[in-house]
Amino acid sequence: MEKSLHLEIVTPDRLVLSEKVDYVGAPGYEGEFGILPNHIPFLSALNIGSLYYKAGGKTHWIFVSGGFAEVSDNKVTVLAESAERAEDIDLERARKAKERAEQRLAQAKEKLDSARAQAALQRAMARMRVRGAA
């Protein structure tokens, strides 16, 4: 039996990560799910949040802004709208984005404006959580 997984995280712009890992935890729409080696194949939609993986006894965090995860043959492929490693997140930029989203949410007059502001707030807060977890 295989003792590791190959994790790839891809965005429309770039390959964010490609490495052997021991475990992957991801933010699914129905809640967080975990993947160990030899997991049954499946496909899941991802929510905005924290994806983490364990490799070499360390836990690593990555912000993902939605997308999909596919598990097959000890390979986890994440296709994300955007993804950032914890160490690459600009915390000050995330704080400013959070403040702007909160202001837009308070001033939203239409349902669409409110939904966009809520999504922006969720992304900013997830980035801040991931950066804090690093």
From Swiss-Prot:
Q: How does it assemble?
A: F-type ATPases have 2 components, CF(1) - the catalytic core - and CF(0) - the membrane proton channel. CF(1) has five subunits: alpha(3), beta(3), gamma(1), delta(1), epsilon(1). CF(0) has three main subunits: a, b and c.
Q: Does the keyword Cell membrane apply?
A: yes
Any single GO CC term annotated in Swiss-Prot or TrEMBL for this entry:
proton-transporting ATP synthase complex
Q: Which UniProt keywords apply?
A: ATP synthesis, Cell inner membrane, Cell membrane, CF(1), Hydrogen ion transport, Ion transport, Membrane, Transport
What is the phylogenetic placement of the source species in the record?
Answer: Bacteria, Pseudomonadati, Thermodesulfobacteriota, Desulfovibrionia, Desulfovibrionales
Q: What does this protein do?
A: Produces ATP from ADP in the presence of a proton gradient across the membrane.
| Name under which the protein is recorded | ATP synthase epsilon chain
CDD domains in alphabetical order: F1-ATPase_delta (cd12152)
List localization entries.
Cell inner membrane
Alphabetized GO MF terms: ATP binding; proton-transporting ATP synthase activity, rotational mechanism
The parts of the chain that form a coiled coil are none
Tell me its family: Belongs to the ATPase epsilon chain family.
- Source organism of the structure: Nitratidesulfovibrio vulgaris (strain DSM 19637 / Miyazaki F)
HAMAP family, alphabetically? ATP_synth_epsil_bac (MF_00530)
Q: How does it sit in the membrane?
A: Peripheral membrane protein
Major location category of this protein? membrane
